[in-house]
Amino acid sequence: MSKTYQATGIILKGMPLGEADRLVTILTSEYGLIQAVVPGARKHKSRLRGRSELFVVNQLLIVKGRSLDKLIQAETLESYPGLSRDLGKLTASQYLAELVLSLALCEQPQIELYELLNEHLRRIEQKATPQTLYPHLAQAVFHLLAIAGVAPQVYQCCLSREPIETNFIDSLWRVGFSFESGGAINLSSDRRQPFQPSDDLKKEIFLNKLNWKLTAVELTLLQQLGQKFLPQAYDIFPMDVAISSIDVAWIKIERILREYAQYHFGRSFRSATLVDTLAPVDF
């Protein structure tokens, strides 16, 4: 990397530095995560003031420094003004930014991650409504987990490797979900080998590994998240499934994926806790 270099990146984090500067963390497609000082960015008349704000995409000119790089020029390519005008959208986007910061690499190209984040920010800004914010957020998190190589298994039992068939007829039907095992667990199949404890002990060990239990509606929604776009509810559910149950299911799925991500990345996401205030529901 030369003393001066160019990159295309999105601002994911910023904080005051000194009297008038700003320290920003940027996800670039060419070099992954970089930190840079933006001189004078907090001055009212600075040309870099607005361009160093959260979720602004810029073509950047950066000077390589001994400890910190210095951003000296930025030409805005895209921004997401709609995010800051809606508390729900802003909260969801800040959560995604934290998640990306935990999985992005430094000094390595991150083209796929960069493009995926921008795509989901676009969807949240332009398409998400109060009713569809949770589905958009859940799919974004699932796609990010997939890039990191830790997306949960939702089609097969993590223990038996057998396909899981949802049961909409039996209202008591449930499937387990285990962070440690990596996804769904068929509650009627516990075939771990070679260890064969007594039935009582086996049941205790098995249940302790379950973090959640999912209904047929919840598992079906979870299975749609790997697709590029989410299908309409009437395409995947029987006619007698209530829309209200689907809305609540999305809230639960977001919570499950958040806890799953925290387990696998070994950290909590501060912005994610604010998501709970958007639709307070106890599970």
Curated annotation (Swiss-Prot):
GO terms of biological process kind: DNA recombination; double-strand break repair
Pfam families named in the record: RecO_C, RecO_N
SUPFAM superfamilies membership: ArfGap/RecO-like zinc finger, Nucleic acid-binding proteins
Function: Involved in DNA repair and RecF pathway recombination.
Protein name as catalogued: DNA repair protein RecO
InterPro entries, A to Z: ARFGAP/RecO, DNA_rep/recomb_RecO_N, NA-bd_OB-fold, RecO, RecO_C
Gene Ontology, cellular component aspect: bacterial nucleoid
Family from the record: Belongs to the RecO family.
Keywords per UniProt: DNA damage, DNA recombination, DNA repair
